[in-house]
Structures are given as structure tokens and as C-alpha cells.
Amino acid sequence: MFKRSLLSSLALAVSLSATAFIAKADGEQYFPLQSYRVGPYAAGGTGFFGGFIDYLKYVNANGGVNGVKLTWSECETEYVVEKGVECYERLKNGLNGAPAAATNPLSVGIAYATLDRSTADKLPLITINHGRTDSTDGSVFPYAFPLQLNPYSEVSAIINYIGQQSGGLDKLSGKKIVTLYHGSPYGKETNEVLQALADKYGFTLTLLEVPHPGNEQQSQWLNIRRAKPDWVILRGWGVMNPVALKSAQKVGFPADRIIGNIWSNSEEDAAPAGAAAKGFISITTHPSGTTFPVTQGIKKDVIDAGHGDLADPKRFGTVYYNLGVVNGILNVEAVRLAQEKYGHKPLSGEQVRWGFEHLKLDEARLKELGALGLVQPLQLSCSDHEGGGAVRFQQWDGEKWNLISDWVQADRALLRPIIEASAQKYAKEKGITPRDCSKAS
């Protein structure tokens, strides 16, 4: 009798332990991370995912999201599309019972390759500052979110800035602009809209491709020297950026007439070019720096506690790192908002999608988050999965970036018909019936 009772007690204890483990896993919200920490784009990957992970750790250190702790795991993609797809399939179903909230590959190629999969799996695909521009139209792309800045908004804002520097958009007529772009889906994304802007404003556009990864550009810069453009727009990535700046110096093209895009704007893009980078201008959706309350909180609760993700602590507060923090804020806010509708518990990707689509970050909320000045005000909706569309311009002084402009807004009214036409074409090709956003709730 005693033996049977003991065995029953042991069985109950094992059962309770298993239940407790499962409950713990089920009480967490999972973020699958298709990261890249090796290869020619490792600087971007390590900085971005370092900031993202440190923000998740910071949230956990302060109680999680309404008591729900966050968990994550990484799968190395090396920025290779095929590996990114493999990682997506490996991670999409969650971890130990914790459901996946969203996928954040930080790669246009991987985003394109997993778009249909994420839609079928009802898992939000977050492409902050990049991705398919037409995925801004949430009526056709319910699960894709090019948060803050889509590629068309990026180049529209750059042209608007060049117009400001020229005395007005009407003064662009007759100007010569070269776009030097990375030979990838990301690099080619804006060619069509740049030509449309050239036709509208009367400037001459020259498009020059740099093959991946971008460490050989001599012929392109010789062409630029012959063309004598007024401005060069650099749509680079990774090693391509410092090579471009050094190549420009060799042919005598001034750095302060080169404008880097959103992936040509980090310390890792400018510093390796040395003196050739001084004066270089780029856009940004967020500044570098460590003085924001949220970054100070991360330093206190995560980094000073010995739990920071960065291998090199000097990268704390850099452009790539802070973008990861911004991305963390937006992902966690979507979860928090969705919890207000569906309950303070781990949520499905479909439920988190609702949170992303209803994101509204005004100055009051950004101040509460300690991110005022770090994140631009955003408001998303069924029809608008971008929510921002503004950039600031910064200039490299040889050691650091300095902001040189206020917010410059893209011409979203001009871009919207182009976006909708592309989205409708995609819908027709895929047999998608667009949602009626007037009935979205």
C-alpha cells in the first residue's frame, strides 16, 4: 500500500513538473530570429539583432509584456536566401509551446522568398525600412509590414532633400543624378520609381549596378567621373559602402555630394573609409546615441548586468544597434496592443498581426517608452502598413554622425497610386481578393 502510494505520489510529482514546464513555455511569447552574424553583411546583422535582443532582454528584466515573458532563438542565414527560407521553416511553429509573434529577417531577398509562406502561416513579416514597397497596401498584403519607411518613400525623401538644397523641386530640371545600387532585389527595388521622379522633375537619371558584394567598383566610378553628376545616391549594403567612398575619393568626386540610403548610413559604413568618408551625407529614420531613456534603461538592466548581446560593447548606441532597439519597440508594442484585445497571454501570429495593423505611436506614447526622438511618430492601418515615411539627414564628420536636417517627408500622395497599382497587379497574379479596409476593425 505504501509502495503504491509512493509510486502514485512520484507519478503525480512528475506530472506536475511536466505541467509546470509546459505552462512556463506556454506562458512565453516567441520571436524567431533569422539572423546573420557572419559574411559580408555581418556588421548590419550583429548590430541590428544585438539591439533587438537587448531590447527583448530589457522588457523581460522589467516584467515582460503584461507578465508574459519573451523568448527567442536564432538561426544563421548568412544573408543567403535559401538559408533564410530553411530558417523560417525551422522556427515558424514556435519554441516549446511558445507561439511565434512575427518574423524579422532584415533581408529583402529572404522577405520576398518567405512572403507567401508567412501569409499562409498567418505570421507577420516585418521588414523595417525595407522590403516590398507595395506591401504598404495592407488590403493585399495583410501580413507584411514595411515599418517606418518603404523603399519608395526613401528615394522620394532623398529627391525632396536634393530639391531643398537646389532651391526647390522646380530647380531639379537639368540636374544630373546617378544612383549607384547594390546588385540584389533590394538594390533594384527603387529603379522604376526613381525614373518616374526623374520624368516628373526633369532631372537626368543614370542607374549603375554594383555586383554583390560590392568590393569592386572601379568601372562604375570612372563612369561617374565622366558623367559629372550633381549628386550620387548610394544604395549600398555592407562592404559596398566604404568601397564606394574610397572609390569616389580616387576619382575626385566629393563625399558631400553623395547621399547614402538607409542601408548606407551606419558607423560601419563610414569609418572604414577613413578620410574619404568625411562630409558624406546619409538618411536615417533614427539617430545614433545612448542618451535616450530607453537606451539608458538597456544599459543599466542588460549591459551593465553582463547580459548584453554585442561582442563589442563600443557598438552600443550605433545606428545599426539603435535600429534593432527601434525594431524591438515596434514588435513589443504590437504584442502589447494585441494583448489589450485578445488577453494578457501569449498570442498567435494572427493576433499579433492585428496589433501591428493598429500601431499608433504618438509623442506621448513615445515619451512613456523612453523613445521620444529615437522613433518617429507612427500610425498604421489596414491600408497603410508603413505608417511613417519620413527621414532625417546626417553627415559624417570623420568620427561620428551629426544630424543636419529636420524630418523630410516622402511625397506619399504621389507614391500611393504607384503602390496601389503594383499591389493590385500582385493580387491579380496570385488570385487574391483585397480586403475592404473600410470594414476593417
Which residue ranges define each predicted feature?
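Bacterial N-terminal signal peptides
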Residues: 9-18
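Venus flytrap/periplasmic-binding-protein-like
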Residues: 77, 125-127, 132-136, 213, ...
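Segments of small-molecule ligand-sensing domains
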Residues: 308-321, 332-406
